[in-house]
């Protein structure tokens, strides 16, 4: 039987220090929050759609993610509450977009880095 943990404690101080120093410059909390927000497959599809087309109405998004308008609206409200999406009303239609360029850039970076990665 193979054991997937170290059988002895042997710490490489240089590696540990290097990684800890690097972690001080990484926005770990922000990245963690984005991963939590994107932990739902439907929300990932919605965000991807909003990256592809800058703005989409709820009906189009529901069709894209193959969900009801009600379920899609629920996810969109969640994304808005988390600061990821904005909306505007135009007559009887509601259009959603990503909140700003900073959000767009961070999410694009995350999604592009995971293309083709098998989990």
Curated annotation (Swiss-Prot):
SMART domains from the UniProt entry? HTH_ARSR
CDD domains this protein is in?
HTH_ARSR (cd00090)
Q: Which residues bind Cd(2+)?
A: 6, 10, 57, 59
Q: Which domain of life is it from?
A: Bacteria
InterPro entries per UniProt: ArsR-like_HTH, ArsR_HTH, HTH_ArsR_DNA-bd_dom, HTH_MetalResp_TranReg, WH-like_DNA-bd_sf, WH_DNA-bd_sf
GO MF annotation terms: DNA binding; DNA-binding transcription factor activity; metal ion binding
The UniProt entry, under PROSITE patterns, shows: HTH_ARSR_1, HTH_ARSR_2
Q: Which residues bind DNA?
A: 58-77
Is Transcription tagged as a keyword? yes
Q: Where is the HTH arsR-type domain?
A: 23-118
Q: Which Pfam families match?
A: HTH_5
Q: Which GO terms describe its biological process?
A: response to cadmium ion
Assigned keywords, A-Z: Cadmium, Cadmium resistance, DNA-binding, Metal-binding, Plasmid, Transcription, Transcription regulation, Transposable element
Function statement: Metal-binding repressor for the cad operon. Involved in resistance to heavy metals, such as cadmium, bismuth, zinc or lead. Metal binding causes the repressor to dissociate from the DNA.
Return the NCBIfam families for the record: HTH_metalloreg
Q: What does the subunit section of this Swiss-Prot or TrEMBL entry state?
A: Homodimer.
Protein name, UniProt field: Cadmium resistance transcriptional regulatory protein CadC
Task: Please give the organism.
Answer: Listeria monocytogenes
Q: What is the lineage of its organism?
A: Bacteria, Bacillati, Bacillota, Bacilli, Bacillales
């Amino acid at each position: 039987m193979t054991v997937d943990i170290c059988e002895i404690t042997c710490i490489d101080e240089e590696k540990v220090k290097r990684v800890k120093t690097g972690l001080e410059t990484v926005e770990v909390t922000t990245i963690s929050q984005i991963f939590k927000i994107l932990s739902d497959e439907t929300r990932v599809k919605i965000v991807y759609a909003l990256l592809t087309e800058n703005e989409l109405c709820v009906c189009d998004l529901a069709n894209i993610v193959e969900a009801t308008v009600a379920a899609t609206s629920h996810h969109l409200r969640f994304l808005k509450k988390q600061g990821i999406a904005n909306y505007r009303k135009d007559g009887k239609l509601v259009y959603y977009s990503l909140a700003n360029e900073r959000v767009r850039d961070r999410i694009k970076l995350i999604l592009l880095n995971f293309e083709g990665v098998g989990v």
